[in-house]
């Protein structure tokens, strides 16, 4: 067990319930940790509704790893059962239900992407569970017991439900079951702490209530912030194009991270690295480069990160790509959302739409050094493209500006 607890608060938005000055382990997570009589069970549930994980997701897994390093057991719950419903939190419409095959395929991809973050090797540090183990076998009597622990009013107060109800948008009964099933996960694995984003407080609180209902000691909730994406305004999301995927190649990852807006750099260092926040470089450009190098090293190794840094530098400083020689194109002249082939044809490179499509399909178009391979990829908003460079072939470059 570590005797330094600074890791607990770093990047943490809220712990509940929490009276940090108290010595009572029932109301103070720090007191529970300092008690040290046994490893705590730290629950994190993930619903594999997609195949990719991005840096916004990584925040919570980094915190889980910190608990592992402090000697506790990470209980990673793969929501193979709940993913078929989908978490309705914050959603303005019903989620598409996935097949069991979809979920299993996504889960395997998730676990592969998590290997650079979590400790999969040390005995007792990681427990991987699938919530179909206990949810698939629930009989009607048990389901009615779960439903009896909450009121319709409590459910409608949940983010997303009330908005849809007020607008007359359907809210289906199976969606009401989602927070109860997530809460029952906490009963099944007897978690001491549950990690989640700030949008998960309701669901985690339901878990506390259900643990109390079934005679267990209620878990603590530890909430982590939602990472703002590369556009500097909206949460990181693949659909918005403002993300950095964990499975991206080193150069693509580096090129994106060295352009993180200045206003976000401090948050990115706090949430995505272990760098001493008091010892960061004073020069903003140097901070961006250090951030990119650190994060890429975590997922690709130091050697690959250094190579990516060199390649990125050559991209903007080589004889054909002097930064000052790259023309700029205002994104205000592009209609969004925009498909990739339309974007490439619209930014002053002298290509028709059909030519742009062929160039993309032939692998001749890059965005910040990463190949664009789908001419129909949709860029939702211009903010995610600010400052990025489109390259066609070896000699055509344009920098996108707002």
From Swiss-Prot:
CDD domains: S4, TyrRS_core. Pfam families: S4 (PF01479), tRNA-synt_1b (PF00579). It catalyses: tRNA(Tyr) + L-tyrosine + ATP = L-tyrosyl-tRNA(Tyr) + AMP + diphosphate + H(+). A motif ('KMSKS' region) lies at residues 235-239. A motif ('HIGH' region) lies at residues 48-57. ATP binds at residue 238. Keywords: Aminoacyl-tRNA synthetase, ATP-binding, Cytoplasm, Ligase, Nucleotide-binding, Protein biosynthesis, RNA-binding. One of its GO terms (cellular component) is cytosol. Its EC number is 6.1.1.1. Residues 338-402 form the S4 RNA-binding domain. GO terms for biological process: tyrosyl-tRNA aminoacylation. InterPro entries: aa-tRNA-synth_Ic (IPR002305), Rossmann-like_a/b/a_fold (IPR014729), S4_RNA-bd (IPR002942), S4_RNA-bd_sf (IPR036986), Tyr-tRNA-ligase (IPR002307), Tyr-tRNA-ligase_bac-type (IPR024088), Tyr-tRNA-ligase_bac_2 (IPR024108). GO terms for molecular function: ATP binding; RNA binding; tyrosine-tRNA ligase activity. It comes from the Bacteria. SUPFAM superfamilies: Alpha-L RNA-binding motif, Nucleotidylyl transferase. It is found in: Cytoplasm. The keyword Signal does not apply. Belongs to the class-I aminoacyl-tRNA synthetase family. TyrS type 2 subfamily. HAMAP family: Tyr_tRNA_synth_type2. Catalyzes the attachment of tyrosine to tRNA(Tyr) in a two-step reaction: tyrosine is first activated by ATP to form Tyr-AMP and then transferred to the acceptor end of tRNA(Tyr). Homodimer. This is Tyrosine--tRNA ligase. It comes from Synechococcus elongatus (strain ATCC 33912 / PCC 7942 / FACHB-805). The gene is tyrS.
């Amino acid at each position: 067990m570590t005797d330094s607890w600074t890791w607990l608060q770093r990047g943490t938005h809220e712990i509940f319930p929490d009276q940090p000055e108290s010595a009572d382990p029932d109301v103070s997570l720090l007191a529970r940790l300092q008690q040290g009589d046994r490893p705590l069970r730290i629950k994190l549930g993930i619903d594999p509704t997609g195949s990719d994980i991005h840096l916004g997701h990584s925040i919570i897994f980094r915190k889980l790893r910190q608990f592992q390093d402090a000697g506790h057991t990470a209980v990673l719950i793969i929501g193979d059962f709940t993913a078929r419903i989908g978490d309705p939190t914050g959603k303005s419409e019903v989620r598409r239900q996935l097949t069991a095959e979809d979920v299993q395929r996504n889960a395997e991809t998730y676990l592969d992407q998590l290997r650079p973050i979590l400790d999969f090797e040390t005995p007792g540090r990681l427990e991987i569970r699938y919530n179909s183990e206990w949810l698939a076998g629930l009989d009607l009597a048990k389901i009615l017991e779960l439903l009896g622990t909450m009121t319709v009013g409590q459910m409608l107060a949940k983010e997303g439900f009330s908005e849809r109800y007020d607008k007359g948008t359907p809210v289906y009964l199976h969606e009401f079951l989602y927070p109860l099933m997530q809460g029952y996960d906490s009963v099944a694995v007897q978690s001491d702490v549950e990690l989640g984003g700030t949008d998960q407080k309701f669901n985690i609180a339901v878990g506390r209530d259900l643990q109390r209902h079934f005679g267990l000691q209620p878990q603590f909730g530890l909430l982590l912030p939602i990472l703002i994406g590369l556009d500097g305004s909206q949460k990181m999301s693949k659909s918005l194009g403002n993300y950095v995927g964990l499975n991206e190649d080193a150069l693509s990852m580096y090129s994106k991270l060295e352009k993180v807006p200045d206003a976000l750099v401090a948050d990115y260092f706090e949430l995505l690295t272990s760098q001493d926040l008091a010892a960061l470089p004073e020069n903003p450009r140097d901070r961006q480069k250090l951030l990119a190098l650190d994060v890429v090293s975590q997922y690709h190794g130091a050697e690959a990160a250094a190579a990516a840094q060199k390649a990125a530098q050559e991209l903007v400083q080589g004889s054909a790509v002097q930064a000052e020689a790259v023309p700029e194109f205002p994104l205000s002249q592009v209609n969004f959302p925009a498909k990739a082939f339309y974007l490439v044809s619209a930014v002053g490179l002298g290509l028709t739409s059909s030519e742009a499509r062929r160039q993309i399909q032939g692998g001749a178009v890059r965005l910040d050094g990463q190949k664009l391979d789908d001419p129909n990829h949709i860029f939702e908003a211009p903010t995610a493209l600010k400052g990025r460079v489109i390259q066609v072939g070896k000699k055509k470059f344009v920098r996108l500006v707002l």
